[in-house]
């Protein structure tokens, strides 16, 4: 809720050690919202941080009967399919190696890239692979995994639209890499919002 985020951000800007005492706030000081969101907002001099996230599990739209059809993991084994698919662990290891050999700037650029096969697409690719591999004509139960993920991003996009206090105000959106493809598609498709890539604002451009 916005009121909880407001109290947490105020506690952070006053004394970050007190943030854990905020009623209703269940994130610790090491959480990405605090370490990235609050820290960046404070550095930029923002008075508040908008609560735009919408928490929803992949299985949120599935019934107990649907859950019985769930595979052990929503991650598809790349070795079990005949098309290119990078496993999450392999993707993380590859990105860690690039980070070890490169720079943080290059790392952040890659995380925000939407090229085919980029790190940001891994989550979507595995959701689609799992849903389609376990579906057949007339049986679409596991497509609910994809539907829930898209629905979550739709709720987030709606919250982003309602975040500004005035028309024309710009909003800086900070999200995990896996949300970038879905949010970019939604925000680009809307007639009232125009997403702008953060890449030119990263130094060295």
Q: Where in this protein do the model-derived segments appear?
A:
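Structured, acidic catalytic/metal-binding patches in enzyme active sites
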Residues: 1-136, 197-203
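A cross-kingdom marker for long, charged
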Residues: 139-205
């Amino acid at each position: 809720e916005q009121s909880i985020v407001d109290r947490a951000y105020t506690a952070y800007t006053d004394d970050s050690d007190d943030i854990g005492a905020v009623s209703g706030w269940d994130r610790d000081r090491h959480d990405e919202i605090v370490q990235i969101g609050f820290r960046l907002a404070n550095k930029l001099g923002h008075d508040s941080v908008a609560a735009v996230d919408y928490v929803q599990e992949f299985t949120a739209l599935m019934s107990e009967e649907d859950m019985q059809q769930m595979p052990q993991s929503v991650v598809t084994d790349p070795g079990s399919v005949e098309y290119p698919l990078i496993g999450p662990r392999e993707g993380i290891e590859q990105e860690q190696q690039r980070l070890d050999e490169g720079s943080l700037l290059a790392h952040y650029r890659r995380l925000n890239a939407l090229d085919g096969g980029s790190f940001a697409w891994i989550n979507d690719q595995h959701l689609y692979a799992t849903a389609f591999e376990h579906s057949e004509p007339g049986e679409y139960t596991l497509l609910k995994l994809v539907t829930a993920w898209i629905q979550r991003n739709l709720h987030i996009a709606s919250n982003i639209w309602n975040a500004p206090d005035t028309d024309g105000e710009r909003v800086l959106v900070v999200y995990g890499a896996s949300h970038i493809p879905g949010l970019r598609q939604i925000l680009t498709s809307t007639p009232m919002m125009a997403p702008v890539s953060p890449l030119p604002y990263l130094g060295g451009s």
